[in-house]
C-alpha cells in the first residue's frame, strides 16, 4: 500500500474478505511512522447490511476521534451492491447513501466539506448508474 508508512494519510477500507488480493486484514494497521494510520474492516460475504453500517459508523467515529484530514478521498466500491455479480456484501442504494452522508458530515466538520469521490468497482450496468447517481446526489446535498 502506497501510504502505509505515512502518518499524514489515514487509510480506511471496509471490504469483503477473504477476497483478491488477500490483503486487508484487521492486523494490517500501517508500517513504521504510519503505524496506526490504517484501519481495515474485513467482512464476510453476506454480512447483514445493518452490521455493515454499524461497522462503518463505528470506524468513521474512531478515525474522526484521532485524525483531522485536510481532504477526504472516497474510493467507492460499488461491487458491494446487492445486484452486483462479483461482490457478495449485498448493500442497497440506501446503504451507500447513508455511508456517503456519514462521510460528508465528517468532512463538513473536519475539512470544510472537501471530499473527492472516485469509482473503484461495480459491474452490474443495470444497477450501477442509479447507485452512483444516488451517491453523487448525497455528496452534492447541502
Language-model segments: residues:
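A general "terminal functional-core" signal
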Residues: 1-142
Amino acid at each position: 500500500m502506497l501510504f502505509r508508512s505515512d502518518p499524514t494519510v489515514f487509510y480506511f477500507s471496509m471490504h469483503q474478505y477473504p477476497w483478491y488480493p488477500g490483503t486487508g486484514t484487521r492486523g494490517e494497521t500501517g508500517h513504521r511512522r504510519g503505524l496506526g494510520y490504517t484501519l481495515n474492516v474485513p467482512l464476510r460475504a453476506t454480512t447483514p447490511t445493518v452490521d455493515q453500517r454499524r461497522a462503518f459508523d463505528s470506524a468513521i467515529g474512531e478515525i474522526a476521534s484521532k485524525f483531522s484530514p485536510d481532504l477526504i478521498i472516497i474510493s467507492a466500491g460499488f461491487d458491494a451492491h446487492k445486484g452486483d455479480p462479483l461482490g457478495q456484501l449485498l448493500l442497497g442504494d440506501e446503504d451507500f447513501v447513508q455511508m456517503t452522508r456519514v462521510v460528508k458530515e465528517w468532512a463538513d466538520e473536519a475539512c470544510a466539506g472537501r471530499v473527492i469521490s472516485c469509482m473503484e468497482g461495480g459491474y452490474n450496468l443495470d444497477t450501477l448508474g442509479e447507485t452512483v447517481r444516488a451517491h453523487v446526489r448525497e455528496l452534492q446535498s447541502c
